[in-house]
Amino acid sequence: MGLIVQKFGGTSVGSVERILNVANRVIEEKKNGNDVVVVVSAMGKTTDELVDLAKQISAHPPKREMDMLLTTGEQVTISLLAMALNEKGYEAISYTGWQAGITTEPVFGNARILNIETEKIQKQLNEGKIVVVAGFQGIDEHGEITTLGRGGSDTTAVALAAALKAEKCDIYTDVTGVFTTDPRYVKSARKLASISYDEMLELANLGAGVLHPRAVEFAKNYGITLEVRSSMEREEGTIIEEEVTMEQNLVVRGVAFEDEITRVTVFGLPNSLTSLSTIFTTLAQNRINVDIIIQSATDAETTNLSFSIKSDDLEETMAVLENNKNLLNYQGIESETGLAKVSIVGSGMISNPGVAAKMFEVLALNGIQVKMVSTSEIKVSTVVEESQMIKAVEALHQAFELSGSAVKSER
C-alpha cells in the first residue's frame, strides 16, 4: 500500500514490556500492507541519566564527548526493538542516525538536518524489512556524531517521512493527542480532532511539549500529514495538516504555557540604527534564542532593551553580554527570574478583532499582571509571574470556551 513512519518517545519505550507493546503496534501497521520505518528515542529517563553521569565527571564536559555519550541511549532502544520484531516473526534491521544517512550541520548538541540519503533504508524496505532508526542523531561532513537537541526524535521522524515521501508520520506519545491546553493542569481541557500546521507550530513554539517546532516546520514545508497518538490506547489522535474545517468559528484553539522564563534588561544602549542588530546578532552567534522583545527609549541618545529567554540560557546570556560590553556599549544589565509565558493561539484571530483586549481584560479581572506582550496574526503571548501561570491558563481556557464539544473539528 504505502509507507508509514512511526515515532515512539522515551515513555513509550521506557521498559522491555513497553518495547514489546511498541513492536505489536508496528506489526499492526505492517499487517495493513504498509512499509514501516520506526524512529525511537532513548528508553525512559536514559538521556537524563547519561547527562548526570557526565556531570559527575565534569561540570563542563566537551560538547563533542556529550554527543558521543548521549547517542548511546537510542542505540539501546533500536537494537531491542529490532530484536522484538524479529522474535515475533517480522524481519527488522536497526540503524543509527549516521547509518541511516542523516547528515547534519557541524554543530554539537543542537544540529540541524541538512540531508538524508535514503538508499540504504529504501533497499531494506524493498526487501520487506521493517527499518528501525535512532532518533535525535546524525553525522556531519567531518564524520563527527551530532545530536539534534530537544525534540530531535520528532524532527528525525518527520524528516525521514519527507525524504522517503511517506504517506503519513504518526507520532506516538504518552497522551492521546493535542489538547486545548495541558489536561494535567486544566481538567476541562479537550482533545482536538485536527489542527492546522500554523496553529500547531505556534503552540509548539509557545511551550506545548507534544511536538517540537522543527518537526512541525518540516511537516508544513513538505506537506507531511502528522497524527499525534497514544502508544498505550487505540483511540484516534489529532491530525495535523494544512487546512482544518471547524464546526464552529473558534477564535482561539488552544492555551499554551511555559515556565522558567527570565527577562533580561539591557540599560543605556546607544540609540543608533545598528545597536539592536549588533546585540541580537551577538546573541544569535552564541545560539541563544530570544523570544519577546520590548524597547523603550530613555532619551534621544540611549534606549533600554528587555527580552525574554529560557531560564536555562541565563548564565550564558549574561556571560555573552558581559564579554561583549565594549562592542555593545551599554551601561548596565539585570535579569528577572521566576516568570512564565502564557499564550492563546487560533487562526480565527485573523478575522476577529478584540481578542487581545479580551485576553488582557480576563487577566486583569483575575489580578494577573502582564509584564511583556508579543503578538502575531494567530497568537498573543504574555509574560506573567510564574506563581500565577496556572491561574492565568485556567481563566483564559474558560473565557474562550475551550471546554467540551466546541473544540472538535471536521477533516
UniProtKB/Swiss-Prot annotation:
SUPFAM superfamilies in UniProt: ACT-like, Carbamate kinase-like
Site (Contribution to the catalysis): 7, 74
GO CC annotation: cytosol
Keywords: Amino-acid biosynthesis, ATP-binding, Diaminopimelate biosynthesis, Kinase, Lysine biosynthesis, Nucleotide-binding, Repeat, Transferase
Entries under Pfam families matching the protein: AA_kinase, ACT_9
Associated pathway: Amino-acid biosynthesis; L-lysine biosynthesis via DAP pathway; (S)-tetrahydrodipicolinate from L-aspartate: step 1/4; Amino-acid biosynthesis; L-methionine biosynthesis via de novo pathway; L-homoserine from L-aspartate: step 1/3; Amino-acid biosynthesis; L-threonine biosynthesis; L-threonine from L-aspartate: step 1/5
GO term, biological process aspect, one: lysine biosynthetic process via diaminopimelate
GO molecular function, one term: ATP binding
EC assignment: 2.7.2.4
Family: Belongs to the aspartokinase family.
General function of this protein: Catalyzes the phosphorylation of the beta-carboxyl group of aspartic acid with ATP to yield 4-phospho-L-aspartate, which is involved in the branched biosynthetic pathway leading to the biosynthesis of amino acids threonine, isoleucine and methionine.
Protein name: Aspartokinase
The gene coding this protein: lysC
